[in-house]
Amino acid sequence: MSNKLEQLRKLTTVVADTGEIDAIKKYQPEDATTNPSLILKAAQIEEYAPLIDASIEYAKAQSNDKAQQVQDTCDMLAVNIGKEILKTIPGRISTEVDARLSYDTEGSVAKARQLVKMYNDAGITNDRILIKLASTWEGIRAAEILEKEGINCNLTLLFSFAQARACAEAGVFLISPFVGRIMDWYKAKEGRDFEASEDPGVISVTDIYNYYKDYGYNTVVMGASFRNIGEILELAGCDRLTIAPALLAELEAAEGEVVEKLVDSKGSKERPAPMSHAEFLWEHNLDAMAVEKVAEGIRNFAVDQGKLEDMIAAKL
């Protein structure tokens, strides 16, 4: 019998949640996802130094203003890392919009267009890019605009059913519901561990997946933010799963049968009317975990973006 990673690949598209080229080469995922924290981590790897230098050179050619140079360097660095990753995968790279734009639809759209233009100028076509946006109301509206322009989006920091429903209704390409961070919240609140089958994060993604399939939404469900391989295996059959290198290694080393847990119902139920802004805010607000985790996630990504900018500013 093949290892659990090989078996999982037969049921689910496996994506690598990393900006590290060596890990991507090793595990040969279909796609890869990055975020500000992963870009910061990658930027500290010695082999990426030439990418930072090239990004600084680009930024200096665009503007004489130091603050603008820092912004342009960070954007180009994310794109340069994405370009390197694309050399090693057949599918798509997810590159994230600055988390500080999470409540700014126009700002998010402008930043997304800028990132896509940088990729396009380097010969990378839109069908190899996903733009990551936070699943705030403003982020979802930005994605709705971008999707109509042929820019596919990956809606991240998704913790509530309201967020998932609003994303489907906006016609976004893909969502990344977080599993481990949901479990973290309940573990801290209830002071106990959860079996994978009763893990609140696993249950959340399962409910979203089943809802999408029952109502015939085309939005791809990509489970994210895993704490252990038990969570991953409980979601075998999900459209995609984005997995950190350490957990890919664990799956590769694990023997035993992988059972398909999520099955596409291929339903065609009559869809409800799209949520209004007020309905979205109310439904999302009823989920205390989601409210806390979205805010925390945005803050943490913004902190890491700031650290990256400080690192770049010191090199300019």
Swiss-Prot record:
It is an enzyme of class 2 (transferase). It holds the Pfam family TAL_FSA. Pathway: Carbohydrate degradation; pentose phosphate pathway; D-glyceraldehyde 3-phosphate and beta-D-fructose 6-phosphate from D-ribose 5-phosphate and D-xylulose 5-phosphate (non-oxidative stage): step 2/3. Keywords: Cytoplasm, Pentose shunt, Schiff base, Transferase. SUPFAM superfamilies: Aldolase (SSF51569). It comes from the Bacteria. It catalyses: D-sedoheptulose 7-phosphate + D-glyceraldehyde 3-phosphate = D-erythrose 4-phosphate + beta-D-fructose 6-phosphate. One of its GO terms (molecular function) is transaldolase activity. It is found in: Cytoplasm. This is Transaldolase.
